[in-house]
Amino acid sequence: MPHITHSEFLLEQLKRQRERSFLCDCTVSIGQAQYRAHHNVLAAFSEYFSTQSVDAGREDPTITLDPESVSSAIFEKLLTYIYTGDLNMDREEIESVQKAASYLGMPEVVARCTLSQDNIKNVGSPMRQAEYEDPRSPLSPDDYEPLEPISEVEERELLREDRAGDDLVSMDEAQSSSEQTPQRVGKRGRKPKTRLYEDEFEVETISAQRGRGRGRGRPRGRPRVRPLSSDSTDQSPAHQAMSPNGSSTSRGSGRPRGRPRVRPLSTANEDPRNVEDDPAANKDQEVEKGNEEQKKETGEKDDGKNDTDNPEEVTAFKRGRGRPRIKPVSTEDQTTNSENVTTNAEDGSEPAKTKDSEGTGRKRGRPRSKPVSSEDPESVISVEISGEEAGEETSQDAEKHTEEGTEDSESNPGNSVRISKRKRILSRKLKESQAGDEEEEEEEEMDDEFENDNEDWAGEEEVKPVQDKHRPICNICGNLFSEMSSLRRHMRIHKGLKPYQCTLCTRSFRQGNQLKTHMRIHTGEKPFTCTSCDSRFAQKCQLVYHCRMHHGEEKPYKCEFCGAAFATSSNLKIHIRKHSGEKPYECGECGKRFTQASTLMYHKRRHTGEKPYICDTCGMAFAVSSSLIAHNRKHTGVTPYICLDCGKPCLTAGELRKHMDVHNDIYSLKKHSILKHNVVPELETTQTSKTDPTQCPLNIPIDHQGLIARVRSALVDSQDHEIQMEPPLPILPPETSLTIQQSAEPQMIIQHADGSEPSMIFQHAEASEAPMLIQHGEPGEQVSYVVEQYEIPATAEMEHTQIVIVQTID
């Protein structure tokens, strides 16, 4: 993957945001064409937009350009240049682009347009111009001189490539000859092929002629030739012939791609005399190998010189990138290996790699082992700092550890191989995740990682188990999540981002599945069907709620205060607010508070007058969706609510509850019977109701409610009241004449509570003992009263000792 600079990455992200109209807060209008863009980006490139953006503000984000000065086609090119840095224009468009750039105040574009029109045919970005100026890049057809035919140039390029191919073939032949030389034998008895890399100067010359291509099979961004450390001081003549100035001694043979790496014995190619004289040669090799690796990684070029000057100090094996380090083995293994190497060297045969020596080093992809307790870390550090002195100290330490290792190996042979539990756990994970042939870049990262682990392990006394991966946590609210993707979706709540927008109603959502569910409202799709009835739903949660409400399924959410059960947790949460009195939703207009957000929304529509729900049949609008549903039942004739007592159909549940009051109130039933069925109620019912005046249900006009309440309270508070029981009241016919006499000391008063009508003062005639029926008002709108007289003790609140209770008869 090519390296992308910070500026290129920023431009690419801004371009993608503009293409998606994400965070675009400016609209540029040219005639009928409109372009969405970002204020700050336009203002950064244009002086015109920097002034217009301030004047426009938030109320009017549209900026209109003059089509005569800036056409839509030219503005598209300039807009592309602003967001990408590429300005592509033909010779005929240079003048128009220059005019538009001058109008918009873009001096950089004006400077480009002032160049010669003959030399500007396709003005690109500065990056592309640098590629054209690079002599190593392939020539484009426009760069050839017009007098030279293009066909001849192509033939010349083909000849150059063929010549470079011949050079590579000669290198392959030298490689095949080098493969015939005796090599180390792998642990399975195979002889891995060894390929000699070409000289740096020759390969760089060939690659420069052919262009900047990467080698076949090599990863992107990796050089074709990589110097390796020497695998052996004894090399074949073919090796020495291919490496002038003895440079091949400092380079080793790499394995072909796809071939397994073979880790040689620490004494495989070493002089037998050195093995016999120095029993700690393995550790010297490991330390020297680490020194050479550090020099090679830091870019030092004096590896070959140091190796040739001191051939005795050069170890037989030097670890390349990703190669395992060798752990010192016990004395028995070292002695056995030394004897085997000496015997094989005298016979002239290749020393074989044994299983014992194989187990002491880590395989490819395994972590470096932690030093055992018998090893002295200070000796390792001293060896890395100095040369011969470090070797002597290491030899002494090795002899000391050999004596200890002999006893340990006899008692428990596994101590010399297994180091720690942590190593075992990490090795298994890495072996599973890194199966197959890994890239060398990954091996370098592993080396760096395990080197840091070795530093940590050097200071540890006890082996600690591998800790689990930390769960992602929100740094704002502290919520924990199982995955980073869940945390990213959660952060949209705090940032207020809703990137998913509906194209039909412009509603926005935080997640894509929310938009998918919302689209079912427009399409009418209802994929979830109830198994008990034919109801269908757009969401699964709606189906679950339906089954719990209408089909007897258990309601799992119960109130801890009153025991009421609910189908959803949200309904329970709203119900608990009734007990706590919490009303978190407040109206900004009048300050009224509500327990639900939906109730607040409906309340706000009273202030604004908004009625978004419109009937498709008659066009009537409503503020609440339930009102529209009840209204549609008038057109369809559907009456889902029916009274069980009389069978009356009702449109809504509220209408049914209001109707049930007729059956529960005896006087309301009497009124209903008289009005609807012309049936006079029986007198026994009236007589029975008079036995207790305090419990007498009276149905009187609303303006007499206050008087009745005072009468009942007076009757209850009085302990010595006596009620004069009268015979059943005869209702006089309307034509009966009544005598109403004026009196200064009235005995009976009828007065409306609101004072809308004048007081009526009357009394009985001397010869009359029965109550009378009084009618007053205009003809056609007369109100009839049945007068009943009660004698009660006078109180401070009552003005008269006699109170009249009246009942209206329709």
Curated annotation (Swiss-Prot):
What keywords tag this UniProt record?
Answer: DNA-binding, Metal-binding, Nucleus, Repeat, Transcription, Transcription regulation, Zinc, Zinc-finger
Regions of biased composition (Basic and acidic residues) lie at 270-308, 350-361
> Bias regions of kind Low complexity — which residues?
243-253
Compositionally biased residues, Acidic residues: 386-396, 435-460
Does Kinase show up as a keyword for this record?
no
Q: Which CDD domains match?
A: BTB_POZ_ZBTB31_myoneurin
Subcellular location, record wording: Nucleus
Q: Indicate the residues that the entry says bind DNA.
A: 254-266, 318-330, 361-373
Any GO molecular function? RNA polymerase II cis-regulatory region sequence-specific DNA binding
- Gene3D superfamilies the UniProt entry points to: Classic Zinc Finger (3.30.160.60), Potassium Channel Kv1.1, Chain A (3.30.710.10)
In this chain, the C2H2-type zinc fingers fall at 472-494, 500-522, 528-551, 557-579, 585-607, 613-635, 641-663
GO biological process terms on file = cartilage development; negative regulation of transcription by RNA polymerase II; regulation of BMP signaling pathway; regulation of cytokine production; regulation of immune system process
Region of interest (Disordered), ranges = 122-146, 169-466
Tell me the protein family, please.
Answer: Belongs to the krueppel C2H2-type zinc-finger protein family.
Name recorded for this polypeptide = Myoneurin
Native species: Danio rerio
User: What's the encoding gene here?
Assistant: mynn
